[in-house]
Amino acid sequence: MLVKRFQPFLVHLFLWNCLILFALISPIMPSLIILISVPFALIDLWLCFTLGLMLRLPRQRQNTEIRENWISEEKVIDGYPVRWLRTSIDEDKPLAILIHGWNSRPINMEGRSKIFLDSAYNVLLFEMRAHGGNLPVDHWAAMHVCHDFEEVLKIYSNNGWLDNGFIVHGHSMGGFIAQRGLRPELETSKNLKGLVLESPVTSYSLINNATCKVLRIPASLHPWMMKRLLRHYNSMNKDRYTVTDVEFLESPQWGLPDAPTLLIQAKHDSTLGQGHWKHLVDVHSRHDSNFEYHIVEELKHSQERSNEGRDELISDWMEKESLIF
């Protein structure tokens, strides 16, 4: 699959080699042709190589032993074993689904789940593919995980787990997945009662720009690189995962759930910066939505399994929205 990731680089490398070979056998000033071509070739090959680098893979981890009081389950979706942890299901209680962030694992959301357990919820910790010690993948994309999430929501609905309503808490990339998987037009979203977004990703363009900056790609080329990356991505994926344009990958086109939404944002977010939460606030300011947000001084982007300030804000919001049972 590395060949697919770096296919543009390999194709362009072949074409530039062909051009140089042609120049060498050409009777018309071969040295001049090569001299002019080399700078353009180096720039073009570097930009092609970065396309493969931009298709990042999660860090591979070891499986960990399932802790007491958690039940591990999985369902094969599109050839991949999608997993989750859950508590014993009380059919009279609502459900809280928590989605971890990039390079994390579901059990890292256990601390965040306590507030929902204390509020009489069944709790389920959803695992993104290729995380938490699960099987690695050749190519990872948010659209793959969104499809997984939408499919398992159908399973949960068929099991009756969503009948009493459900809340979703998504952290970072987990928040991005939640926004897509809880679109109002989906049948499984009809019993959604609330959404908590903790320092969420809200725009893939912003992710792309940050990656381009790390790769020392000039800012003027960022939009062009994003469009080029989309073409490369679409060539690697099935039609169900196709991304039509850049705007599709950010709120509100990506998804704007029709439920009370609470944004809790780390004030000093060293991972995502300020652009993502500001974009989401702007989107909700232009829509008639039940939206509340808090910028929390004492909250970091990661390593916050327990945070009293965050939990207090969630508890107050749940009480205000009549979500405590």
Residue ranges and their predicted role:
Residues 102-115, 275:
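The serine-hydrolase catalytic nucleophile loop
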Residues 116-135:
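Conserved alpha/beta-hydrolase
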Residues 232-325:
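Serine-hydrolase catalytic core
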Residues 1-11, 15-85:
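An N-terminal hydrophobic leader/cap segment in hydrolases
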Residues 169-178:
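Gly/Ala-rich beta-loop-alpha elbow adjacent to hydrolase catalytic centers
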Residues 93-101:
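Short beta-strand element of the alpha/beta-hydrolase
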